[in-house]
């Protein structure tokens, strides 16, 4: 019983520490103190938190720290960054260096930073239409053969920043796509890689990236079994 009490106490302490870390992170990210953020979004209906959004890039309700808004974060290619910014800016009034408002009560704070050959963009917003527009626009992080070109395609024993990026940036995007959408993405990239990747290198990258996805490995397995059945017959 005492052990359960201590575990519960440690869990509550960890939760408090996580909450404090979230508060500090959001203040730093949007360069605004928590009181201001809470006041800005105070008029947001609590029912908004149940709005459904696609899994990628996802929208996290920040009500746990008293901010009635969604946090949206994703990495995009540098070439896509102006398009992303325009989604935020067009049709909204700029009321601060990072803040925009629509219809008087729909607020958006925007932040961006260079991040592994791309841009990490973040929103704090109660604008459901904007969240849906961002989700529907199909923004993607820079592909691994650009973001980590110097490491090559041997990515089976990653560590440090590269491991973090693959697991938390790339995989999160890549696994949000269907296999057909992955096929289309790769086909769209094919014409731009000739200047720096040979056919053999390109094939190595594709094998390394695609086999990270369990669905693709299952597809390969099914194709192998089918070929075996066809050969037997």
Give the ranges of each region predicted by the language model.
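Polar/charged low-complexity regulatory segments
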Residues: 2-233
